[in-house]
A protein has these predicted regions:
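Conserved small/polar residues in nucleotide/adenosyl-binding loops
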Residues: 1-6
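Beta-rich, blade/repeat-based domains predominating
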Residues: 7-21, 57-73, 106-137, 167-189, ...
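Beta-propeller domains
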Residues: 14, 19-21, 26-54
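Short loop/turn segments that connect beta-strands within the blades of beta-propeller domains
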Residues: 20, 36, 71, 82, ...
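Conserved beta-strand positions in repeat-built beta-propeller and related beta-rich domains
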Residues: 26-34, 77-81, 140-143, 182-183, ...
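A short loop-to-beta-strand structural motif that recurs across blades of beta-propeller domains
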Residues: 37-41, 85-87, 147-151, 189, ...
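Short loop/turn segments that connect beta-strands within beta-propeller blades
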Residues: 43-48, 90-94, 153-157, 204-208, ...
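Blade-level signature of beta-propeller repeat domains, shared across WD40, Kelch, NHL, RCC1
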Residues: 275-308
Length: 308
């Protein structure tokens, strides 16, 4: 996958998603000063560049999901740093709505709604990723700000929140990613990657804490296909989990080398094909292959083909 055929470049690649036509969408953080440069890039399933858009997220591009609603598909985008907003877009990049911090929650400094700046803290809004609820609406993780999970209806109206900063049993330290695990149809669960605690936390669909699953290396986000849960870990590997959240396989692991070698993130000459540096997001495509976006200086996307 390459954008060298276009006039654009990318920096730190953050998230990746696939639509029903197997087109690939990648968001990078970008640089705030490049105000006319896009944050979202679209490729065909062979990695050929198609188009780009989303300059409004430059310097803060982060979360990206494709969601089908009725007969249409939409992009949901979250942005942190100085942007501090989340949006619903068409697949061509037209904005349907954009929203800022939910002041109804009484969690945030009023500045987060009125005039966001690149300021961090537990009273700041730094949205990272989405999960979509089975009866409509969605959850939004404030993974770098207040550490809350917010619940919205299908129109983006804030309803409630749970979590916050704490010890890891219903509270978080960087709740970076999340997923609705509906592999048990009768009892869907919310799974949150509590990144700095190196765990997954499990909740019922109403947000009641159920369990903590340890043993990860900075888990960043989640995807699922069939009975397999996919967890990219910033600690240099991608894990596949069964219905009981037990590890089936770990792909591209380079944990020891990345931990013990300085500067790998910045030095492309130290990257190894098939080995990961810092997986920040991953998803299955329509063929069961896995796409991984990495938190490295010049961005990297890797495709792992399913063994058949």
């Amino acid at each position: 996958m390459c954008i060298r055929d276009s006039e654009y470049s990318w920096q730190t690649t953050h998230n990746i998603a696939v639509d029903s036509q197997n087109r690939i969408y990648v968001i990078h953080e970008g640089r705030q000063e490049l105000k006319d440069h896009p944050s979202i890039f679209v490729f065909d399933d062979q990695g050929k560049f198609i188009r780009a858009f989303g300059s409004q997220y430059q310097g803060g591009g982060h979360g990206l999901e494709v969601q089908r609603e009725g007969s249409e598909e939409f992009l949901y985008v979250s942005a942190y740093q100085q942007v501090k907003a989340f949006s619903k877009l068409t697949l061509d990049g037209d904005v349907i709505w954009t929203k800022r911090a939910p002041q109804e929650s009484k969690i945030y400094n009023q500045e987060e709604y009125d005039a966001p700046k690149k300021v961090w803290g537990r009273d700041r809004f730094m949205p990272t990723n989405f999960a979509f609820l089975p009866k409509g609406g969605f959850l939004l993780a404030d993974g770098y700000g207040a550490f809350h999970i917010h619940r919205y209806d299908q129109d983006g109206k804030w309803l409630s929140s749970f979590g916050g900063a704490g010890d890891g049993t219903g509270k978080f330290n960087t709740p970076h990613g999340l997923w609705i695990d509906d592999r048990d149809d009768a009892n869907p669960k919310i799974v949150v990657t509590d990144r700095a605690h190196n765990t997954l936390q499990i909740f019922d669909i109403d947000g009641k804490y159920l369990a903590t699953i340890p043993g990860f290396g900075l888990p960043a986000n989640i995807d699922c296909q069939g009975q397999v849960l996919l967890v990219p870990e910033l600690g240099a590997r991608v894990s596949l989990l069964d219905r009981e959240y037990k590890v089936l396989a770990q792909l591209g692991s380079d944990v020891e080398r990345i931990r013990d070698t300085k500067g790998v993130r910045e030095d492309e000459s130290l990257w190894i094909d098939g080995k990961f540096v810092h997986p920040h997001d991953a998803c299955f495509d329509r063929n069961g292959d896995i796409l991984v976006a990495e938190w490295v200086r010049t961005g990297r996307v890797t495709k792992l083909e399913r063994v058949r």
